[in-house]
């Protein structure tokens, strides 16, 4: 299986410009099966390296077909550098349910190290601090920014096989906080978002003023959010306040389900709701903008010497030939076009 995938993915890269790289997947049999999620890592323009796992559906070989993308942002329990827990630990059940569903899609799951987290404990979406932090359209969260840059580049470099009207996002706990933040920062990117226990109190803390300040950023994106009413970690009041603010701002694309008696780890319950997965894949986005993509001078500077030149194109070609997951032929062509236009 591993050898077969390696040969296929290498051939796919040389012929179609698809992202590649194969490694062992989850060791947890009841979650994601082994050897199906390939390994990758990306060094962002801020110098941080993000490990990630991605999955290409069996029908990926079909010529001319494009696929939706399902992105999962893990919670604090899946942090690390093993490039495994974000697809194998608790909190990834919805990711697994999507994998086992009848929907063919490309899947990607970045990992944050244990030394940090996607969203600061005192700045969850809906808090006064979060509203102040993103007032200029940016957020100083280094690993979240690196992950968003990775996702933007992954989508752009594989644009030949990705249906950009169907970019889906989910998150659990701190990863759900990241999902809320990603929509606020990139309101035209995602077709559907499922945050689970993603903001609250006393962490956050979510306030009516903080929620009202960002509510308009969520009006155009279909969101189905979940929270347990007995959550002792992120109290449900935070989600209540944020949801109310969005609805008061005129939001009509927001669904909110309270899990009665649900503690913090509600993700297994959500994953057992087939209507959630059906809802996700029914959503389409006709206003897609890849605003997660860094400036071309950053994206195409493979050797990070501050200049895009033929040396960068050669590095990309060598990486592709060696079976690396960093670049595709689309990236090489974009580099040559950038050089020619200088």
Language-model-detected regions and their locations in the chain:
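Sec-dependent N-terminal signal peptides of Gram-positive bacterial secreted proteins and lipoproteins
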Residues: 4-23
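The conserved beta1-alpha1 loop
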Residues: 68-74, 197, 227
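Active-site machinery of serine-nucleophile hydrolases
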Residues: 76-145
């Amino acid at each position: 299986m591993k050898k077969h995938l390696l040969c296929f993915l290498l051939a796919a890269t040389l012929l179609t410009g698809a992202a590649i790289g194969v490694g062992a997947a989850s060791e947890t049999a009841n979650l994601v099966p082994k050897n199906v999620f390939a390994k990758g890592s990306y060094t962002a323009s801020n110098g941080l390296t993000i490990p990630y796992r991605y999955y290409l559906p069996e029908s990926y070989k079909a010529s001319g077909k494009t696929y939706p993308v399902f992105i999962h942002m893990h919670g604090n329990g899946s942090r690390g550098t093993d490039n495994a827990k974000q697809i194998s630990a608790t909190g990834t059940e919805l990711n697994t349910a999507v994998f086992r569903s009848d929907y063919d899609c490309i899947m990607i799951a970045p990992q944050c190290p244990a030394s940090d987290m996607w969203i600061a404990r005192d700045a969850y979406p809906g808090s006064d601090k979060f509203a102040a932090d993103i007032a200029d359209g940016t957020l100083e969260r280094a690993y979240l920014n690196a992950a968003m840059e990775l996702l933007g580049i992954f989508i752009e470099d594989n644009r030949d096989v990705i249906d950009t009207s169907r970019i889906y996002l989910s998150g659990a706990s701190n990863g759900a906080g990241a999902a809320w933040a990603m929509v606020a920062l990139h309101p035209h990117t995602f077709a559907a978002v499922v945050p689970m226990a993603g903001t609250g109190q006393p962490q956050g803390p979510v306030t009516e003023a903080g929620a009202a300040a960002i509510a308009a950023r969520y009006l155009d994106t279909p969101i189905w959010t979940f929270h347990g009413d007995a959550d002792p970690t992120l109290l449900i009041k935070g989600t209540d306040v944020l949801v109310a603010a969005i609805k008061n701002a005129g939001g009509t694309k927001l669904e909110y389900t309270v899990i009665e008696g649900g503690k913090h780890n509600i993700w297994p319950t959500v994953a057992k709701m087939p209507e959630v997965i059906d809802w996700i894949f029914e959503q389409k986005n006709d206003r897609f903008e890849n605003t997660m993509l860094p400036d071309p001078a950053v994206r195409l500077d493979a050797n990070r010497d501050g200049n895009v030149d033929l040396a960068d194109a050669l590095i990309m070609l060598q990486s592709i030939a060696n079976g690396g997951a960093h670049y595709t032929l689309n990236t090489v062509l974009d580099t040559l076009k950038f050089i020619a236009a200088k």
